[in-house]
Each structure stands twice: as C-alpha cells, then as structure tokens.
Regions:
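Single-stranded nucleic acid-binding surfaces, predominantly the OB-fold ssDNA-binding core
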Residues: 1-81
Length: 81
C-alpha cells in the first residue's frame, strides 16, 4: 500500500532531519514529506506551503487515520534503516 520511493537525510543540527517521497497504493506520489525532530522525538510532517497570512498549510492531507499511521511508520522505518 505504501512505499518510500526516496529518502534524503540532512546533516546538521536543524530540527528537519529528512525529506521523503512516498507512493500510495501505486497510484499517487507525495513529494516533500518531512521527518522532523520535535520535543517528543521524531515525527512525520506532510508537505506544506506558507500562505499570504504567514501560516503554514498542508498541500496534501490524509483523511484516513490508518493511512496516516501507516505513512508515519513507513517513513520513520526508512529513516531509521
């Protein structure tokens, strides 16, 4: 169902640790998924754009909780491999 097509780890002390491209059901490619180090550990963030209001808005939103969880697990597993 999910495949991490590409994962690019970043060096340095930034909270941003990696970018990933994820294929969903062999039909959709989501580029720019991010792995971020937060205060509670690593988490996965969907691609975002900054609006004219200065706020960040997701470009792609996963509506199914199981799909969100599967995407997070797949990306973090690829990051930790």
């Amino acid at each position: 169902m999910l495949e991490v097509a590409r994962l690019h780890k970043l060096n340095g002390d930034s909270a941003l640790k990696a970018f990933a491209d994820v294929v969903i059901s062999g039909q959709m490619l989501v580029k720019g998924v991010r792995v971020v180090e937060g205060k509670d550990g690593l988490f996965v963030s969907m691609p975002q754009n900054q609006g004219k209001d200065g706020k960040w808005h997701e470009i792609v939103s996963l509506l199914d909780d199981e799909l969100k969880q599967a995407l997070q697990e797949a990306v973090l597993e690829a990051f930790n491999a």
